[in-house]
Amino acid sequence: MASTKPTDQIKQLKDIFARFDMDKDGSLTQLELAALLRSLGIKPRGDQISLLLNQIDRNGNGSVEFDELVVAILPDINEEVLINQEQLMEVFRSFDRDGNGSITAAELAGSMAKMGHPLTYRELTEMMTEADSNGDGVISFNEFSHIMAKSAADFLGLTAS
């Protein structure tokens, strides 16, 4: 396996950070951090997330800025972690049947049916409404990443109440 240069890893980490900074404020909340870690294949419990946040949060503001994340994670990041992001893109592409960079309702319905999970019209509408955050009628890779992150956060029991 070819080695990845640290500058490439930082760029990839910045892209990942931006994808999970759901409110685009330049920092990650506990929920956003949990979703990011889950996407990297790291599966900490809720109490571990709190502890990790406290350790990473060097300026004590209760959230993680990109530079804090780099200091904490770069020594441990490896190609295997970055491959998980590639796998997410592969899943997205499998739904994006025409390869135009977005998933339509028809593509979502077709893919779900092909996987043995046909959707009712209502289920399809609810899924599209939840995932399509900008309301353009299709799901972009960013929206897909966010919905996958939200699913991971829900799974971890870290949803905001």
From Swiss-Prot:
Residues noted as binding Ca(2+) 4 in the record, renumbered to the chain: 132, 134, 136, 143
PROSITE patterns associated with the record: EF_HAND_1 (PS00018), EF_HAND_2 (PS50222)
Keywords: Calcium, Metal-binding, Repeat
Sequence positions that bind Ca(2+) 2: 57, 59, 61, 63, 68
InterPro entries associated with the record: CALM/Myosin/TropC-like, EF-hand-dom_pair, EF_Hand_1_Ca_BS, EF_hand_dom
Disulfide cross-links: none
Induction: By touch and during darkness conditions.
UniProt: Ca(2+) 1 binding residues: 21, 23, 25, 27, 32
A Pfam family per the record: EF-hand_7
Residues given in the record as Ca(2+) 3 binding sites: 96, 98, 100, 102, 107
Domain (EF-hand): residue spans on this chain: 8-43, 44-79, 83-118, 119-154
GO molecular function (one): calcium ion binding
Function: Potential calcium sensor.
Name of the molecule in the record: Probable calcium-binding protein CML16
Organism of this sequence: Arabidopsis thaliana (Mouse-ear cress)
Lineage: Eukaryota, Viridiplantae, Streptophyta, Embryophyta, Tracheophyta
Primary gene name: CML16
